[in-house]
């Protein structure tokens, strides 16, 4: 594997601490790409287990699997799925870049804590979706799509019957009627998933302009005759 002789940046990833979090900020295939650009990748042992990546996968890709203390001490930049706690921020050396979903839209105090600690925050949620060159890094689209898909699957699992129409010798079961509130990224994915599962889908959004998107997926738009787009 062709690599630069000297690494210019050390990028580190720690175990996520949020309960039930199974994602990891760096996967082995991205490690390979970063190594080709001369980036040293440090992974805390076990960081990828919940995402079905073992330490050996990272080692084979060119990462160094080390302790959490090692990652914190050596990294120039740290990647996170969920933002690190204030206690963890206090352990990170000044000048380190903190990259992830930092909740910057709703928590000014947390942003201030990053600044107070002498760190550089890179809030992925503020990445402009309109930039075509940055769309592959748009966490809002990718993660909200996952949430919408999962929501439809969880609902289907919790429902006490079938979603599609089923006709057998014993009779006919009518398809389930599903109402989805919100036709943003997550809502549209939920609509598409529920339709593919065979449900009759109706969706609502406060934006009248979303009607076309809803109907393009084969769902019915619930029109309440109200326009909230102007506040």
Each model region followed by its residue ranges:
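Short acidic-hydrophobic, aromatic-tinged amphipathic segments that line or gate anion-handling sites
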Residues: 64-68, 122, 221-224
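Short, acidic/turn-prone active-site loops that include or flank metal/cofactor-
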Residues: 70, 103-106, 126-128, 207, ...
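Glycine/serine-rich phosphate-binding loop and adjoining beta1-alpha1 elements at the start
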Residues: 2-10, 15-16, 84-177
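An N-terminal-biased, well-structured beta-alpha scaffold segment characteristic
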Residues: 2-113, 117
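Short, hinge-like loop/turn segments at secondary-structure boundaries
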Residues: 58-62, 139-142, 218-223
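Glycine-rich phosphate/diphosphate-binding loop of Rossmann-like nucleotide-binding domains
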Residues: 14-49, 162-231
